[in-house]
Amino acid sequence: MTDIVYDKDADLSLIQGRKVAVIGYGSQGHAHALNLRDSGVEVVIGLKEGSTSRAKAEEQGFTVKTPSDASAWADVIVILAPDQHQRGLYADSVRDNLTEGKTLVFAHGFNIRFGYIEAPEGVDVVLVAPKGPGHTVRREFEAGRGVPVIVAVEVDASGKAWDLAWSYAKGIGGLRAGGIRTTFTEETETDLFGEQAVLCGGTSQLVQYGFETLIEAGYQPQIAYFEVLHELKLIVDLMWEGGIAKQRWSISDTAEYGDYVSGPRVISPDVKENMKAVLADIQSGAFADRFIKDQDAGAPEFLELRKKGEEHPIESTGRELRKLFAWNKADDDYTDGSVAR
């Protein structure tokens, strides 16, 4: 049984005694920074000149420096920029400001696992990864709760990296819910696999195919949308609360029987073999190489695939239906139907 680490197991004073620079002020960046500050930690934000996030960080009371100046000032540098930008950011603004005794913190192990970032000797390298989006991390913290967190140490130059990592995890509220020890390799490979095979890629493709099947059979697109996309949240919420068993306990006998006899017809053993191939590409570094090369070239494949997804008819159907939803919640900075950030 995996040991779970809680607030009582970590010493908050360790991170309170450090100067922390959070590089990036997006979803995770704002949550880490605000939660750490509320936990009594001295925090500055590192952002490039002209960053659209600068005004927001300043409005929320933070001192904003360039990434280079923030890294030079800090004892703990938290790199929360997008994966594809971390390598350049590190080389241009962070690496030369790392001295013995400092700590690098990541919320995802991509750049360490695949060798895009290598820390100099004498620098601790740790991972503190909340298992939820930044807005949830912040909201749960403010409510006196937390989002579970996984923690890893890649380099323990000081001999105290684990203690500081758990202290940081406590500072952002993760140990209120519980923390699990992992490795950079395990976190990176399982996170990418979950996103690609199940949570994002697998689910998106399954929903689109279900929608297409009903439309091609002559059913109304609005009805198809409700059946294969809208109701998905209701089922996933039940699974989140109590696993697949609670989901099956909550549905009708007809739905449960259909689950057993038709699920394996749709998600056949061949799908599992395809999943293994996806995992192999992740483990070998092939996916990372393809992603970074495309990003370095201006992201032509990425942008083409994004555009194709936005043009799928399920999106236009959904936009019209969501206007009718009294319970619909929209983020202030989101344009309905657009993936661009």
From Swiss-Prot:
Keywords carried by this UniProt record: Amino-acid biosynthesis, Branched-chain amino acid biosynthesis, Magnesium, Metal-binding, NADP, Oxidoreductase
Active site as annotated: H108
Residues holding NADP(+): Y25, G26, S27, Q28, K48, S51, S53, D83, Q84, H85, Q86, G134
Gene Ontology biological-process entries: isoleucine biosynthetic process; L-valine biosynthetic process
Cofactors demanded by this protein: Mg(2+)
EC number(s) stated in the UniProt entry for this protein: 1.1.1.86
Statement: the UniProt record of this protein carries the keyword Thylakoid: no
Pfam families listed in its UniProt record: KARI_C, KARI_N
Class in the EC hierarchy, top level: oxidoreductase
Binding site for Mg(2+) 1: D191, E195
Domain KARI C-terminal knotted positions: 183-328
Binding site for Mg(2+) 2: D191, E227, E231
Annotated positions binding substrate: S252
Swiss-Prot/TrEMBL catalytic activity: (2R)-2,3-dihydroxy-3-methylbutanoate + NADP(+) = (2S)-2-acetolactate + NADPH + H(+); (2R,3R)-2,3-dihydroxy-3-methylpentanoate + NADP(+) = (S)-2-ethyl-2-hydroxy-3-oxobutanoate + NADPH + H(+)
Cofactor note: Binds 2 magnesium ions per subunit.
Start and end residues of each KARI N-terminal Rossmann domain: 2-182
SUPFAM superfamilies per record: 6-phosphogluconate dehydrogenase C-terminal domain-like, NAD(P)-binding Rossmann-fold domains
Domain of life: Bacteria
Family: Belongs to the ketol-acid reductoisomerase family.
HAMAP family xrefs: IlvC (MF_00435)
Function of the protein: Involved in the biosynthesis of branched-chain amino acids (BCAA). Catalyzes an alkyl-migration followed by a ketol-acid reduction of (S)-2-acetolactate (S2AL) to yield (R)-2,3-dihydroxy-isovalerate. In the isomerase reaction, S2AL is rearranged via a Mg-dependent methyl migration to produce 3-hydroxy-3-methyl-2-ketobutyrate (HMKB). In the reductase reaction, this 2-ketoacid undergoes a metal-dependent reduction by NADPH to yield (R)-2,3-dihydroxy-isovalerate.
Protein's UniProt name: Ketol-acid reductoisomerase (NADP(+))
Naturally occurring in which organism (per UniProt): Clavibacter sepedonicus (Clavibacter michiganensis subsp. sepedonicus)
